[in-house]
Amino acid sequence: MRQNRRASMIVNRILITLIVLVSLSFLFLRAGPKFSEADRACIQDEWQENKSLNVSSEINNETYQIVFADVQKEFKWIFLPKEISGNPDILMIVSSNRDNFARRNVIRKSWMNSDKNKIVAEKRMKILFLVGVNSENEKENTVVLKEAEVFGDIIVVDLEDNYQNLPYKSLTILLYGQSKTAESVKLIGKIDEDVIFYPDQLTPLINDGTINMSISAIYGEKWNAGVEVSNKDETNKWFIPKYSFKCQLLPSYLSGPFYLTTRKAAERILKSTKHRKFISVEDVFITGLLAGDVGVEKKQLPSMYMYDETTTDTAKAEILAWHNFKNNAEFLESWENLRLSRCKACRKSRNFRGSRSQLDEERNQ
């Protein structure tokens, strides 16, 4: 028995050490090489005036345009949810893949559920999904449109879902938040569907001024200026060709799986797109280059884990958002269990309910 306990303690220590080492390595990477005035000047030189181009905006109630210096595209709002009721301060939009119905249901049962999240129950936060469809695949599109009609929580646009189109999709999120919602919405959140998120953790951050919804700012996990550009290996997911961006180092930016943009910042970013050539690396492009061009402040939030390895289910630190690679059952179980132990604002919430029996019920549905 003692040997088992001792072995368990050793394993736990090893795990803690590994987490610390991984965290330190990410901090080192976030710092990057020294970012000089020459690097800053290079980024500024890449900016283009382009007075003849329109800004990214709605064309009419059915179509909108995303405009870059070298490419301009029009898209259609295929399905829009009914007008948002109440006066929410926050709009969270989940960037969701068309065929991922099961994951959308997991999110509806967890952090989107008004029975388990006070900020949602009080209608201070509205949550929607954004799904892109290929107009040529009518059969799959019919399924998505039926889901949108039944649940009323999906924005559908004619945008093919792939990595290259992520900047268009994320800018669509900002455009919807800026043009399709009441003025009460002051914060527009972009979140990927593989992020465990605790909405009630935002309340104390807003109350203590960590998040200021009245300024032009973007909040998330911040990477400092100086990360090297990947411009040599075309097979690299984060490859940026030199004809799109010639500089060697990147400005500061926020991790793409989760970030919060104030309405003022969203309006500025949308106006700035026409001054830059298209880059497919969404977080660098939108939260780094475009946000930087128009003076949007980039701010670090606490309790952010945007890499799966930076925390575990057995760690103790608070969680606001955790980007991970769990399957649907694991995602739901972790969300429920960590709500009990690593979400202080959840434990204080009057809407908090015993989740273990509830989890069993949901598994059997």
Curated annotation (Swiss-Prot):
Membrane topology category: Single-pass type II membrane protein
Function, in words: Transfers N-acetylgalactosamine onto carbohydrate substrates. Involved in susceptibility to pore-forming crystal toxins in conjunction with bre-1, bre-3, bre-4, and bre-5. Involved in resistance to the nematotoxic C.cinerea galectin Cgl2.
Pathway, per record: Protein modification; protein glycosylation
Principal location: Golgi
Stored PANTHER family: BETA-1,3-GALACTOSYLTRANSFERASE BRE-2-RELATED, BETA-1,3-N-ACETYLGLUCOSAMINYLTRANSFERASE
UniProt record, GO biological process: protein O-linked glycosylation
Record's subcellular location: Golgi apparatus membrane
One Gene Ontology MF term: glycosyltransferase activity
Coiled-coil stretches noted in the UniProt entry, renumbered to this chain: none
Keyword set, alphabetical order: Glycoprotein, Glycosyltransferase, Golgi apparatus, Insecticide resistance, Membrane, Signal-anchor, Transferase, Transmembrane, Transmembrane helix
Organism in which the protein naturally occurs: Caenorhabditis briggsae
Pfam families according to UniProt: Galactosyl_T
The gene coding this protein: bre-2.1
Transmembrane segments: 9-29
Positions glycosylated per UniProt: N50, N54, N61, N212
UniProt family annotation: Belongs to the glycosyltransferase 31 family.
Stretches of the chain found on the membrane's Lumenal side: 30-365
Enzyme Commission number: 2.4.1.-
Gene Ontology CC entries for this record: Golgi membrane
Topological domain spans for side Cytoplasmic: 1-8
Protein name as annotated: Beta-1,3-galactosyltransferase bre-2
Top EC class for this record: transferase
